Amino acid sequence: MLVLATEASGTLGGSALASWTPITTLLVAYAVVVALLWWRGEPADGDKAPLGALQRIGRGLTRTTGIPGWAAIAIGQSLFALLVAGVGFYSDVAWHIALGRDEQLFTAPHAGILLGLLCILSAAVFGTIVATLDGWERGWRVAGFRVPWSMLPLGALGIGAVSGFPMDEVWHQAFGVDVTMWSPTHMLMIMGASFT
C-alpha cells in the first residue's frame, strides 16, 4: 500500500490523502454495512435513538444470521476491528521499512491500528448494550446492564490491547526503536487483538 501511495504522489511515503485511503475505504464499507443492517432490522415500539438504532442493527443481524443480535454485533464488530487493525499493522510495517521511525504518533497506519483496537473494545460495549435492551437473562448484572459472559473476556482483551498503544509510545521514548515486533507493548496489542 505504501508503495502504491509513493508511486501515486511521486514522493517518498506518499501524500497524506493516499496513506489514509485504506482506512477511509474500510470505514465507508463499514457504514454501508451498518446502514443495510439497520434497514433490515425491524423497528420496535419504544426504540430510542441512538440505542434504538443499535438494537435495530442487532435485529437485522439476527434476521440475517439467526443468532442473537448482541452476539452477532460483537462478532461482526470484532471481525471488522481485526481487519482495520491488520491493515493498519501491515501499513505500519511498510511505513517503518520505507521511512524509519515516525516523527509523530498519529500517522495513518497508527490511527488504523488504534481504531481497530478501539473497535474490539466497542464490540464488547455494543454487545452488552444490545443484550441489555433485548432483555438477555444470562450474564453478570452491573449497574442496570446485563453483561453476557462472553463480553467479559472480549472487553478485557479490548482494554489490554488499547492500553498497549500509549504504553508503546512511552516504551519507544525510553528505549528507542525496537529491532523486532516482540516488545512487551507490541505483544500486548498483538495478543489482545489475536485472542479476540
PLM ranges: what are they?
Residues 23-40, 111-129, 188-196:
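Hydrophobic cores of alpha-helical transmembrane segments in multi-pass inner/ER membrane proteins
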Residues 103, 109-154:
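Membrane helical hairpin/interfacial module
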Residues 2-6, 83-99, 159-176:
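C-terminal ends of transmembrane alpha-helices
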Residues 104-106, 139-156, 166-196:
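Membrane-interface helix-loop-helix junctions at boundaries between adjacent transmembrane segments
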Residues 43, 94-98, 122-141, 166-176:
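Transmembrane alpha-helix boundary signature
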Residues 1-18:
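Short, strongly hydrophobic alpha-helical membrane anchors
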Residues 26-31, 76-88, 154-162:
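Alpha-helical transmembrane segments
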Residues 40-74, 132-151:
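Membrane-interfacial, low-structure loops and terminal tails that flank and connect transmembrane helices
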